From Swiss-Prot:
Belongs to the FKBP-type PPIase family. Tig subfamily. This is Trigger factor. It comes from Escherichia coli O139:H28 (strain E24377A / ETEC). Gene3D superfamilies: 3.10.50.40, Trigger factor ribosome-binding domain, Trigger factor, C-terminal domain. Residues 161-246 form the PPIase FKBP-type domain. Involved in protein export. Acts as a chaperone by maintaining the newly synthesized protein in an open conformation. Functions as a peptidyl-prolyl cis-trans isomerase.
Length: 432
């Protein structure tokens, strides 16, 4: 076997391989012997068919199969010998085959980039320092009460957290526009559903009033014909409602799994959940900064085959989320996923190099801790932990999570990490 390797472009490689004629003939004869042992031909007992008849009847197909097998096996031998690491499936380009002559073919593929990590010491990471305070717990209890609130009619003027029912008609330069009209539209104030100025124009008015408000559509508004345009909305305010918050009774508290129905028990449960969310948020915030710094400091070429593979994964995930099937997934435009796919591949290659250079392996104690932390959010943590322990795929996924965390910690060990005090709400709003 003769082998030559050339670079086509960037990460592209072409391996050209020549297989000696006698190697081909030896393999063909060996395979014909195997075929002769199995075939049945009228007039002959099984395994007793003369080789010349076997060769005459099966020679062409056997030769084709042998060539395919030799191409594959010799390519594998070649890349092992040349220490080449292909990224993605190779493309075989067979040359012309002539009986009794050497056979030359080529294989085209991409290789993984050679990554030399740099700039880790210049990565800047700001670690949030946060404590869950009594005021934070109070705020979360208010949120829980608001989620369970009922609405009652209100005679007074509209305020920030009220709910209104309105008819409205929008116009630009005196002309109504598509999508600018609605009847019995229910709007919860303060949720940012409408364009800037719309809710402010309603505040202070009472049920039964009709009025006009002036607003300006944002420059980034999705409808091209409305971007940056001044508009008027004629409003008929039909109903104003205010929240009626439930009291923290034992019955209400038990809805959240606090069996003794006490306020103290609910506060303890809420605090525990908030601290778990906080731990995760801090970890994600630090991780995202470390990875962003790693990517900016290391500009690497990315094999197109890996991007294509990642696009297929993202397509299928998107189709599953919206109830689609395999065919519908492949019809989704690749442009929707290309940027995200490339970033995921880049991050994977860089973290892979961090893992390799630091000789990292998944810490089983960390894996156990991650599973326990995740399980603590469920009603029966022990059942969840047992379920994970018996599922190899889930355990492997969690080991990958742990290994990624360890890689990020290796980056942080060399990065410039500073601490910044912040509040629970500020951090959570940044995560949103």
């Amino acid at each position: 076997m003769q082998v030559s390797v050339e670079t086509t472009q960037g990460l592209g490689r072409r391996v050209t391989i020549t297989i000696a004629a006698d190697s081909i003939e030896t393999a063909v004869k060996s395979e014909l012997v195997n075929v002769a042992k199995k075939v049945r031909i009228d007039g002959f007992r099984k395994g007793k068919v003369p080789m010349n008849i076997v060769a005459q009847r099966y020679g062409a197909s056997v030769r084709q199969d042998v060539l395919g097998d030799l191409m594959s096996r010799n390519f594998i031998d070649a890349i092992i010998k040349e220490k080449i690491n292909p990224a993605g499936a190779p493309t075989y380009v067979p040359g012309e085959y002539k009986l009794g002559e050497d056979f030359t073919y080529s294989v085209e593929f991409e290789v993984y980039p050679e990554v030399e990590l740099q700039g880790l010491e210049a990565i800047e990471v700001e670690k949030p320092i946060v404590e869950v305070t009594d005021a934070d717990v109070d705020g979360m209890l208010d949120t829980l009460r608001k989620q369970q609130a009922t609405w009652k009619d209100k005679d007074g003027a509209v305020e920030a957290e009220d709910r209104v029912t309105i008819d409205f008609t929008g116009s630009v330069d005196g002309e109504e526009f598509e999508g600018g009209k609605a009847s019995d539209f229910v709007l919860a104030m303060g949720q940012g559903r409408m364009i800037p100025g719309f809710e402010d124009g309603i505040k202070g008015h009472k049920a039964g009033e009709e009025f006009t408000i002036d607003v300006t559509f944002p420059e980034e508004y999705h409808a091209e014909n409305l971007k940056g345009k001044a508009a008027k909305f004629a409003i008929n305010l039909k109903k104003v409602e205010e929240r009626e918050l439930p009291e923290l009774t034992a019955e209400f508290i038990k809805r959240f799994g606090v069996e003794d129905g006490s306020v103290e028990g609910l506060r303890a449960e809420v605090r525990k959940n908030m601290e778990r969310e906080l731990k995760s948020a801090i970890r994600n915030r630090v991780k995202s900064q470390a990875i962003e710094g790693l990517v900016k400091a290391n500009d690497i070429d990315v094999p197109a085959a890996l991007i294509d593979s990642e696009i297929d994964v993202l397509r299928r995930q998107a189709a599953q989320r919206f109830g689609g099937n395999e065919k519908q997934a492949l019809e989704l435009p690749r442009e929707l996923f290309e940027e995200q796919a490339k970033r995921r591949v880049v991050v994977g290659l860089l973290l892979g190099e961090v893992i390799r250079t630091n000789e990292l392996k998944a810490d089983e104690e960390r894996v156990k801790g991650l599973i326990e932390e995740m399980a603590s959010a469920y009603e029966d943590p022990k059942e969840v932990i047992e379920f994970y322990s018996k599922n190899k795929e889930l355990m492997d996924n969690m080991r990958n999570v742990a290994l990624e965390e360890q890689a990020v910690e290796a980056v942080l060990a060399k990065a410039k990490v500073t601490e910044k005090e912040t509040t629970f709400n500020e951090l959570m709003n940044q995560q949103a």
